[in-house]
Amino acid sequence: MTRLTLALDVMGGDFGPSVTVPAALQALNSNSQLTLLLVGNSDAITPLLAKADFEQRSRLQIIPAQSVIASDARPSQAIRASRGSSMRVALELVKEGRAQACVSAGNTGALMGLAKLLLKPLEGIERPALVTVLPHQQKGKTVVLDLGANVDCDSTMLVQFAIMGSVLAEEVVEIPNPRVALLNIGEEEVKGLDSIRDASAVLKTIPSINYIGYLEANELLTGKTDVLVCDGFTGNVTLKTMEGVVRMFLSLLKSQGEGKKRSWWLLLLKRWLQKSLTRRFSHLNPDQYNGACLLGLRGTVIKSHGAANQRAFAVAIEQAVQAVQRQVPQRIAARLESVYPAGFELLDGGKSGTLR
């Protein structure tokens, strides 16, 4: 494996360096070919590197940044005042070729705007989309996008997301001829927004896309599709609802509970069932799939959950490594070149509509 250099915005997220720096050391332990540029306040970073050994320090470099973009800042204001911020400096390292990818747990809107400004979208892509890979009950994986980068999406954008998601499923998840579906409120052709139905009509005409139609949200984890496409508002709400339910379910499995005294054999059976079920469903733990790729840019950017713990942020770093190794932006660009001649112009000009 060739050497990789990633830029980490270590000041972003709810916990900042207290989580991101230990996660960086964890990632270095897992990958001997990895070099990390830690972007942020050196006074906050340096004490957290006290436990790093000589070999780890040789693959670390602190890149000073003057400020941090607040998680509650309006994206437009954050972008205007972004010079010298840890997020912008990390993205500039990618733009300058000093790093091959950027990982940040910071403000999503600001990251989207700055990434688009500095790294530029691929030819033929209007706006990038946030994408992640979720496990499903068949022990496989489903690519889901958009997860919040674009609140309102027209039909053209949904088609572009489908193409990008299909490439990611093939190249990173290694699913041959991945099935692609649009998230909708029903499976019937007449259901949903005009933008969804218009996107569906176009996807049916693209030979390189294995389009299977609509899928409802309750089937997200069933494994019925390999790529699920939706607008960012719907995707973000769907993802967070699913994560909340999964966390509650796993928490209930692990809890001992309170109540009346039970015989020793019932308590033993209960604990065995808890451990067995926890192992069975542990692959659904959101920490294991943290890290959404900002797909559609000329460079690689990974958005971590703001509330990510050390383990989860280390997973986001690994997501960046995989995206760089698989050359995802280059492969998407190549696929777009082959698809565009098939016809991308939508009859309605890509306008959004109303629910039917």
Curated annotation (Swiss-Prot):
GO terms for cellular component: cytoplasm. The keyword ATP-binding does not apply. Its EC number is 2.3.1.274. Keywords: Cytoplasm, Lipid biosynthesis, Lipid metabolism, Phospholipid biosynthesis, Phospholipid metabolism, Transferase. Pfam families: FA_synthesis. It catalyses: a fatty acyl-[ACP] + phosphate = an acyl phosphate + holo-[ACP]. InterPro entries: FA_synthesis, Phospholipid_synth_PlsX-like. GO terms for molecular function: phosphate:acyl-[acyl carrier protein] acyltransferase activity. It is found in: Cytoplasm. Its main location: cytoplasm. Pathway: Lipid metabolism; phospholipid metabolism. The keyword Transferase applies. Disulfide bonds: none annotated. One of its GO terms (biological process) is phospholipid biosynthetic process. Belongs to the PlsX family. HAMAP family: PlsX. Catalyzes the reversible formation of acyl-phosphate (acyl-PO(4)) from acyl-[acyl-carrier-protein] (acyl-ACP). This enzyme utilizes acyl-ACP as fatty acyl donor, but not acyl-CoA. Homodimer. Probably interacts with PlsY. This is Phosphate acyltransferase. It comes from Escherichia coli (strain K12).
